[in-house]
């Protein structure tokens, strides 16, 4: 086998771009960001010194050659001046309060102890042009978030830090180095000028964040979750956390599908939302409509003063019919190229009608276990988020089956699930209906469909290439392999192979 060396510089460049373009700008009052050349910046928060590159669990046990944190990257930015006095205060405190690594799998703290803010630190906030507050969170496999302080919610020390810095600073920017959304009620309380979700950007994450903060990259990330005012506003909260069963009462009304249908007023930031350093104008129309797909044309114009990219999002409003549906469903999206001020681009998004179909698990449409398009008017919307997307056109459909399937794992216990009913005024009422319970035995069906057992033949000298050349069948090739070897190929060396990172499942041959 020829030696192959990865072009790490190329991959690092791509990772840096992904980290930057994934950052989501939620607030940017009076264009606080990007940071301007020559501005002095006071960096607050111990997580400036300890960047979360990833979450926990198997996905977090990744060996990287290096990790660039946010502070590491900011120190390389010659355009701004960092307050070295404040950094020294934090560095001395961290010596006495080292990073808590936790106690191994499933026992790593969601957040780190934060330094109590002092008057000396607040003087730094007063004397600099910008105060940058960095908050960090981690979570992951075997260690989901909870509603405790320091997980979904800020700790008292973190909230006090944001509160007091916002009170005295000319401009406060909060950067969230997190793997998922957290409670955001503090934004309305303390009104920081800018809020940036930086997520966990991998080994080049710090560079990506710094590129956005300094304007080398125009903010263009969008929320993949909507952010509600309170954790209790999410309908899944009621039944979360049962280790034995899950009553999926919200049914298809998950995330933005619930809030856009029933609770728009409880949303702080809608699905798909994200600000830019420039502005865009979009015009959309249905370009083509065939039996199985539609093509939506969206013209995006950069109406601002800096170069930037926009994410075009396409949604559909389908008939309520007999099944009930959310007010809008995401069916397509695309990102533009980087557009100069005054430049425009036409983006064409092809959408399969399969993605607009509804699943009938009860047979109420006359087509049980089918994806169907119900009869009625379908309206397409396009824009920069679910809330602001505007109509691109409407068309009619007759009732038709898109795909015939079979019942698999329907619920085994009766309960009531959520359903939307359209009122005369165009709003939606949340009602409930009995969930269809299981009528087929999936275990029995699998047993009936099991292939015949191959009789072990021993080594016949057949190679896999012989199968490719159609000299023998795959069954004849596999029949040569012993049961023990087949098991080893299927499960590898388990979770404890010395040849790979501990915890890696199904390692095979290192």
Regions found by a protein language model. Name each.
Residues 1-510:
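C-terminal non-catalytic regions of proteins with extracellular/luminal or membrane-system context
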């Amino acid at each position: 086998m020829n030696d192959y060396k990865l072009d790490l510089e190329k991959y690092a460049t791509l990772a840096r771009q992904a980290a930057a373009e994934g950052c989501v700008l939620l607030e940017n009052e009076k264009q606080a960001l990007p940071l301007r050349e020559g501005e002095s910046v006071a960096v607050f928060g111990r997580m400036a010194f300890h960047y979360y590159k990833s979450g926990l669990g198997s996905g977090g046990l990744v060996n990287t050659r290096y990790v660039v944190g946010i502070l590491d990257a900011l120190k390389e930015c010659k355009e701004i001046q960092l307050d070295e006095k404040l950094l020294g205060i934090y560095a001395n405190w961290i010596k006495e309060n080292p990073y808590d690594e936790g106690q191994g799998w499933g026992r790593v703290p969601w957040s780190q102890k934060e330094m109590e803010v002092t008057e000396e630190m607040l003087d730094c906030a007063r004397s600099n042009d910008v105060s940058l507050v960095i908050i960090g969170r981690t979570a992951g496999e075997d260690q989901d978030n909870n509603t405790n302080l320091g997980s979904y919610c800020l700790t008292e020390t973190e909230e006090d830090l944001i509160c007091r810095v916002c009170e005295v600073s000319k401009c406060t920017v909060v950067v969230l180095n997190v793997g998922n959304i957290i409670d955001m009620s503090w934004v309305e309380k303390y009104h920081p000028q800018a809020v940036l979700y930086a997520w966990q950007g991998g080994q080049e994450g710090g560079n990506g964040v710094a590129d956005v903060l300094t304007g080398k990259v125009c903010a263009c990330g969008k929320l993949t979750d909507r952010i509600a005012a309170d954790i209790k506003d999410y309908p899944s909260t009621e039944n979360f956390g049962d280790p034995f069963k899950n009553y999926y009462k919200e049914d298809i009304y998950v995330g933005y599908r619930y809030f856009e249908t029933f609770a728009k007023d409880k949303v702080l930031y809608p699905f798909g939302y994200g600000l830019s350093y420039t502005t865009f104008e979009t015009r959309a129309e249905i370009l083509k409509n065939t039996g199985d797909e539609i093509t939506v044309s969206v013209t995006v114009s950069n109406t601002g003063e800096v170069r930037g990219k926009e994410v075009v999002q396409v949604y559909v409003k389908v008939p309520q019919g007999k099944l009930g549906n959310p007010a809008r469903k995401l069916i397509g999206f695309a990102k533009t190229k980087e557009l100069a001020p005054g430049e425009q681009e036409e983006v064409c998004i092809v959408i399969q009608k399969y993605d607009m179909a509804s699943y009938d698990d009860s047979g109420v449409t006359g087509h049980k276990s089918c994806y169907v398009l119900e009869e009625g008017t379908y309206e397409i919307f396009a824009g920069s988020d679910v809330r602001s997307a505007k109509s691109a056109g409407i068309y009619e459909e007759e009732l038709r089956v898109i795909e015939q399937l079979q019942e698999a794992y329907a619920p085994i216990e009766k309960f009531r699930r959520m359903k939307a009913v359209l009122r005369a005024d165009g709003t939606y009422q949340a009602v409930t209906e009995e969930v269809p319970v299981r009528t087929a035995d999936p275990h029995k069906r699998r047993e009936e469909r099991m292939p015949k057992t191959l009789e072990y033949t021993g080594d016949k000298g057949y190679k896999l290439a012989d199968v490719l050349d159609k000299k023998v069948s795959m069954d004849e090739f596999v029949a040569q392999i012993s049961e023990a070897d087949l098991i080893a190929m299927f499960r590898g060396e388990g979770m404890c192979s010395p040849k790979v990172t501990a915890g890696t499942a199904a390692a095979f041959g290192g």
